[in-house]
Amino acid sequence: MEKLILAIIVGCGGFIGAALRYLISENTSKMFNGNFPYGTLIVNIVGAIIIGFIMDINANTSLISGHTKLFLTTGMMGGLTTFSTFSYETINLINCGNILMGCTNAALNLGLSLVGVIIGQALGKIVY
């Protein structure tokens, strides 16, 4: 029964994260014209910052329960960030002849997401 409860916790977080990803991507595409997938880049960076922050706080304090951590990281951030969409968009850009834009997308998503985790961890150390 405990596994089912944990799966429901992850699913609820995933629903919220996926809904946020949809809203961010839709609004971002309206703000920026062009072919570059800014929405995916934004959710991956924001998600990296948030997961770095949560994991650092969890490692250094007891402020976040195991269930809350699971809801926020595996659920919400798992639904918000998206490696599969990023991968598809990158290959699609390359296949459409936008090799530079595809490589830029890959470099920005990877590099800035890694930096995002570092920022999140630093924020966790500052806050707690």
From Swiss-Prot:
Q: Which InterPro entries match?
A: FluC, Multihaem_cyt_sf
Compartment(s) of residence: Cell membrane
Identify the keywords attached in UniProt to this record, alphabetized. Cell membrane, Ion channel, Ion transport, Membrane, Metal-binding, Sodium, Transmembrane, Transmembrane helix, Transport
Q: Which GO BP terms apply? A: cellular detoxification of fluoride
What reaction is this protein's catalytic activity?
A: fluoride(in) = fluoride(out)
Q: How does it sit in the membrane?
A: Multi-pass membrane protein
- Using the record, list the residue span of the signal peptide; answer none if the entry has no such feature: none
Q: Which residues cross the membrane?
A: 4-24, 37-57, 63-83, 99-119
Listed GO MF terms: fluoride channel activity; metal ion binding
Q: Which domain of life is it from?
A: Bacteria
Q: Does the keyword Transport apply?
A: yes
State if Ribonucleoprotein is listed as a keyword: no
Q: Name one GO cellular component term.
A: plasma membrane
Q: Where does Na(+) bind?
A: G78, T81
What's one Pfam family the UniProt record gives for this protein?
CRCB
Quote the record's activity regulation. Na(+) is not transported, but it plays an essential structural role and its presence is essential for fluoride channel function.
Q: Which family does it belong to?
A: Belongs to the fluoride channel Fluc/FEX (TC 1.A.43) family.
Q: What does this protein do?
A: Fluoride-specific ion channel. Important for reducing fluoride concentration in the cell, thus reducing its toxicity.
Q: NCBIfam families annotated for this entry? A: crcB (TIGR00494)
What is the protein's given name? Fluoride-specific ion channel FluC
Encoding gene, per UniProt annotation:
fluC
